[in-house]
Amino acid sequence: MLYSENDKRKHESYRIPLFGSEEESTSIPKYVLKKEPMEPRIAYQLVKDQLMDEGNARQNLATFCQTYMEKEAEILMSETLAKNAIDKSEYPQTAELENRCVNILADLWNAPKDMSYLGTSTVGSSEACMLGGLAMKFRWRNNAEKRGLDIQAKRPNLIISSGYQVCWEKFCVYWDVDMRVVPMDKEHLSIDVDKVFDFVDEYTIGIVGILGITYTGKFDDIALLDEKVEIYNETNEHQLVIHIDGASGAMFTPFVNPELPWDFRLKNVVSINTSGHKYGLVYPGVGWILWKDKEYLPKELIFEVSYLGGSMPTMAINFSRSASQIIGQYYNFLRYGFEGYREIHEKTKKTALYLAKTVEKSGYFEIINDGANLPIVCYKMKDDLDVEWTLYDLADQLLMKGWQVPAYPLPDDLSDTIIQRFVCRADLGHNVAEEFAADFRDALHNLEHARVLYHDKGRNDSYGFTH
């Protein structure tokens, strides 16, 4: 083909190398919408470059959230991103897969066969906790009115340990509930069951038991809590119930410690939430909540919505969202089965125990949680340790190798205790764990041989290190 002077394809940008493009040679607008479009390959690279200096998700040992899924799961989820989970009349088979997931969880959590359990997916455990809390509040209100209690006299209250996740504080603020916090202490790094009933009155909507405290990974003694609640209920017209926040533990414990009584086997446990994107092994974000029986989910919280040609019951706080995470959850259930989950979680537990030994052998730390119940390794510096550096400095050292390992104070009455914690997930294999252990030992060596630089006129409450 012949071309004239005007046909030199000077506007054919595919001939221009990406890093020679006009977009790459000028500053992109960051807080206003740019005027002209650009090629997708250039937009992709620009966005990718903006994220380049972030941490590697696989090395983020601060998060419980899943950072790896199989390629087949990723393909399946990418193919279903456009499906709206709320459009159940348009995507009936997707709704069926969600229903299957609810039934699988009900079986895992030992829902009684003679009761009518029900449940739903959520965006994550935070939404699930909101729904669980709302169900308790509305049920308390209905029962209180029947008893003739003046529900306007004071605010209803919820009882939980100081190891709560922030979603519970949000719930109490959003829905005008008084959060009564049972403080943890050095002897009780989970809920102190003996102190719980110091906080109970007729305005208590329920008690939250935590299966995997975010700070430490420890479990509340839910079986003992259930015993105490049963004693209370036998002698009081006001009936207490227990909600289990199993964001971390409810998709782990059934596989590695199935004999532990914490779930619907306990009489007063009426609802359970979990995060599918934690030990359910799905990318963020999907959560689940189940109620033991329909009597524990007040009817006024269930809405019949006419949408896109069909009527459907819904109670979620969120509405439109992709169904891909629900489908990813069902893929995992189908792919792994009980034995697959058990093998994965047992391996993760083994990794946690190995790393806990590494921490302990260093001689610097007291282990708070060794990963035996939940693969969370948590520790603090020994009380008699005489060193200049802190756990915050150790966190900085590990970050230099890409590892994100948080250090932070415990809540409330233990706020003077600084701890460090790392989460072992399914994608932390033994070989990678060995690399982390080596970096951990190197970090300690560097801290011991660092020259301390004091700041603020010689005071040593703020300092750094040179190497």
What label would you give each PLM region?
Residues 232, 414-467:
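PLP-dependent enzyme catalytic core of the Aspartate aminotransferase-like
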Residues 115-116, 153, 369-376, 415-419, ...:
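Short Gly/Ser/Thr- and Asp/Glu-enriched loop/turn motifs at secondary-structure junctions
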Residues 2, 9-15, 124-300, 308:
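Conserved PLP-enzyme active-site core in the AAT-like
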Residues 1-116, 402-405, 420, 465-467:
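N-terminal entrance/gating region of PLP-dependent enzymes' catalytic architecture
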Residues 365-402, 463-465:
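Conserved PLP-binding catalytic core of the aspartate aminotransferase-like
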Residues 398-406, 441-448:
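A common structural junction motif
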Residues 255-374, 380-385:
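Active-site C-terminal subdomain of aminotransferase-like
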Residues 209, 375-388, 402-437:
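Conserved PLP-binding active-site segment of the aspartate aminotransferase-like
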